[in-house]
Amino acid sequence: MATAICVFMYADANDTIRTGRIDEVVVTAERSRKTNIFETIPVQSLSGNDIRQLGLQNIADAVKRMAGTNVKDYGGIGGMKTVSVRNLGAQHTAVSYDGITVSNTQAGQIDIGRFSLDNVGMLSMAIGQGSDIMQTARHYASAALLAIETERPVLDKGDSRLRLALKGGSWGQLNPSVRWWCQAGENTMTTLDADYMRADGRYPFVLRNGKEKSNEKRNNSDIEQWHGEANVLHKFGDGGSLDTKAYFYHSQRGVPGSVVLYNDNSKERLWDENFFLQTAYKRHIARQWKLAIRAKYTHSWNKYEDTNAKYANGKKTEVNRQDEYYTSATLGWKPTSWLEMALAEDVAVNKLRTTVNGSPNPLRTTSLTALVSKAKYGRMTIEGNIVMTYATESLTESEKYAIKKPEDRKKLSPSLSFSYRLLPDEALYVRAMTKSTFRLPTFNDLYYLQIGNTSLRPENAHEYGAGMTWNSRPIGPLRNVALTIDAYYNDVTDKIVAFPSTYIWKMVNFGKAEIKGIDATMGTEVDIAKGYSIVANGSLTWQEAKDKTEGSATYGSQLPYTPKVSGGLSVMLLTPWVNVGYSATGQGKRYSMAQNTREYQLDGYMEHSLSLSRDFLLGDNMLRLQLTVNNITDKQYEIIKYYPMPGRSVTASATLDI
């Protein structure tokens, strides 16, 4: 039926044309895993097929397997999940969805747990910015970029694909989804995605207090969420393209509290809604020139509610609304075969309306201008850019609450990176980079209740790195081996932190951090027999992140939630009968506070998962059945202190491609 609708849409526009017909071949393509060994900056990628074979449950699970990343996970299926790269902080990491950045000016960090993995075609993490010279100025301004690209199959004219999936698992998890792709014309594709997920999240854990222990169940960890999006992708005859996306997300969840002294009773609730409409137009406007124009409108709404006798009416309620109007234009110029240049200009207007008493309802206008150049001559590639940031704010209720308007902020942020191929006939590269970035204070940093401080300066970060990459040639059954190793040094100054004053906490610029580390990755593919192959990937990070604040009582201590050693491993065995995926992630010991004492120490852990899947051909349709066991050893651990993570869980899924 889906194909018939798609054919009708195509035929209606061309019903006067009579042509002969030859047999056509349907080609479905998925963006394959990239080694990225030739990039001047570290880039790690996971294809959608890798993600599905491993049975990963969410974006955070995938990101944990990338070197240099630190995911804060507050536990449970609905717990908030944020990512920091090389310990610069979640506010320095940009998240893009099909090429355009996702924003949250109020809090400054993105909950990556809200994004579905089911329609991901490629997930990549870049240190610095992405590799596309035509990207937005926001990408160039970020210290790291997590890019989510949705799946786009290649179809014949008038053809369509329908994917129905049902997933269920432990703790009441139920997750149906539907995806539809339609090649409505020779140059136009439409797609629809919808999914629903719910879970009660009442997973068991062992509560320990000294020598005593008891078996408990997690409370207030339920979630119910809906997600839908529609895309229209069109290619023009002049080589241009126009991609338009409408996206909607709604969730209601419990906010699981910390488990302290046998008390994990939490009655906090959170409702989230997010809608955005984005469009991107790209084309070559002359032989040497190309243009990319992007625009986006975002509306975010969230409601926080806490029921507790300590409040005057027994309940506390906060409602926040954010609106963003965003536009971006990038003009690229390639005067010679070895030189490319680009000029990117972004303008964003962000507005916050909140019921929190004392908020001045701020409006921020930000301009980002990036001048970019990339030269490739012989075996050397050099990339450089400089970003100019200008931000100004106005306050609707400044006089009412006697809040001073922050000063306008201006900043130049340069970046330089290069790579050099050491041998002309061997894929062996060395690379180095330096990058300066900064983050503006969030609306919460500036205005939230009494802790906000409108005198805050931007937080500055400087990145330095050097490394080596190698990709082998095929050797017998060994398709390839890809290795990367990068050493880095980062320093962060004017850190924005909450600092105790005489009566209350206050946001201030106080502190300096120095981060030293080494990231290493490995990937290989081996054909072990006809129809049998192994794909293996691993990552390892060693990191020292020290407090270097002069006069601080914790000077020289490892920063909170920063393990010195962390890593991940995944192995896929592909056979004609069943595909087996194994993955493991782990972290060494770390501390929940700046005081590196046993009282605040979190023990290291390793989590192992196993997935079995098989594809069945049913006529012209494909059915995939998959069974995944997460945390096979039922290891109990915490990523955030007093927030226990789930133990062993089982997920079963069926996916039908029509």
Segments predicted by a language model, with ranges:
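Short, acidic, small-residue-rich periplasmic hinge/interaction motif at the N-terminus
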Residues: 12-52, 60, 125
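Extracytoplasmic beta-strand/coil segments of soluble accessory domains associated
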Residues: 60, 64-101
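Flexible loop and strand-edge segments within Gram-negative outer membrane beta-barrel domains
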Residues: 201-205, 215-225, 233-291, 297-324, ...
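Gram-negative outer-membrane beta-barrel transporters
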Residues: 482-491, 509-592, 633
